[in-house]
Amino acid sequence: MESIIEKAEILLEALPFIRNFRGKTFVIKYGGNAMDKADLRDAFAQDIIMLKYIGINPVIVHGGGPQIGQYLKKMGLESKFVGGLRVTDKETMDIVEMVLGGLVNKSIVQLINSYSGGHVKAVGITGKDGCLIKAKKLDAEEYFRSIGDYRPTELLDLGHVGEVEEVNPELLIHLDEDNYIPVIAPIGFDAEGNAYNINADFVAAAIAGALKAEKVLFLTDIEGLKDENGNTLSSATVSQINQMIKDGVIKGGMIPKVKACIQALEKGVNKAHILDGRLPHCILLEIFTKKGVGTEITL
C-alpha cells in the first residue's frame, strides 16, 4: 500500500508543472548516448509522446555525427575534424544529407510513431523543407575564437559547415496546429541552393527562439554543468556561466553547448536545460519533478 501511495504522490508532484506548461512549446535537442542505446531510445520516444498527450508541443532537433562517420567509413571516405567540427566537402555533404535527413531522421520518426497509438504523429523534415532554415557558411575563425581556440587561418575552410542565418517557423506552426511532432535534421540552405551541415545545438537554439519556446532542452552525455569542485549544478545564470568559461571551469566541447543555451535565452526562450541523456526518462524527470535531474539555465 505504501508504494502505491508513493506513486500517487509522484503523479501529484507533476500536476502543477502540467498545468503551467500546457500549450507551451519545448524544443529538444536529441543526441549522444540517448540515440545509441535501445532502452534509452525507447524511453525518449515515450517521453515525447507523454509530453504531447498532456498538451505540451515538443519539437525535436537531432544530431547524428557517429552515424555519419560510420557511413563515410563504409564508403571508404575519411572523416576529418578541425576542433570537433567535421570538414564537409561536397561529397561528404551528400552523405550527411542522406544519413541525417534519411536514415537517422526517419528512424526517430518511426520509433516515436510506434508509441503514439495513432492519435498523434511525428513527421521528419530537414531545414530545407518549408524554407525552415536559411543558412550561411560558418565563419570558422570567429567560431573558434568564441570558444577560445585560436587556429591558423589556413586551417579554417571547413567546406559545407554552416550556421543559422534565419528560421522561418511557419511550417512548424502548421504542423503543431495539425497535431504533428516535428523531427528536424540540422541541414540548412543558402540563396544559391548550397546545403550546409549545422551544429544541432545551435539549430535547436535558433528554432526555440523563433518559436518563442518555453524551454529548450539539450540531451548530453554528462549529468549537467559542474562547478570548480566537480559538483553538478541544479541551476545557473548566464553571468555565472560566462564567469565559469573565463575561469576555465567550462571548457572544450561544453562551450558551444552553453553558448547555444545562451543564444536561446537571448532570443526569448524562458529556460534552457542541460540533461543527462544516459538517464532513462530524463526529460520527464527534469520537467515534472521539483528536484530535476540536470542544470536549469536562466538569464
Curated annotation (Swiss-Prot):
Pfam families: AA_kinase. One of its GO terms (cellular component) is cytoplasm. Gene3D superfamilies: Acetylglutamate kinase-like (3.40.1160.10). Catalyzes the ATP-dependent phosphorylation of N-acetyl-L-glutamate. This is Acetylglutamate kinase. Pathway: Amino-acid biosynthesis; L-arginine biosynthesis; N(2)-acetyl-L-ornithine from L-glutamate: step 2/4. Disulfide bonds: none annotated. GO terms for biological process: arginine biosynthetic process via ornithine; L-arginine biosynthetic process. Belongs to the acetylglutamate kinase family. ArgB subfamily. One of its GO terms (molecular function) is ATP binding. It catalyses: N-acetyl-L-glutamate + ATP = N-acetyl-L-glutamyl 5-phosphate + ADP. It comes from the Bacteria. Keywords: Amino-acid biosynthesis, Arginine biosynthesis, ATP-binding, Cytoplasm, Kinase, Nucleotide-binding, Transferase. Substrate binds at G64, G65, R86, N197. Signal peptide: none annotated. It is found in: Cytoplasm. The gene is argB. The record marks K29, K257 as: Transition state stabilizer. Its EC number is 2.7.2.8.
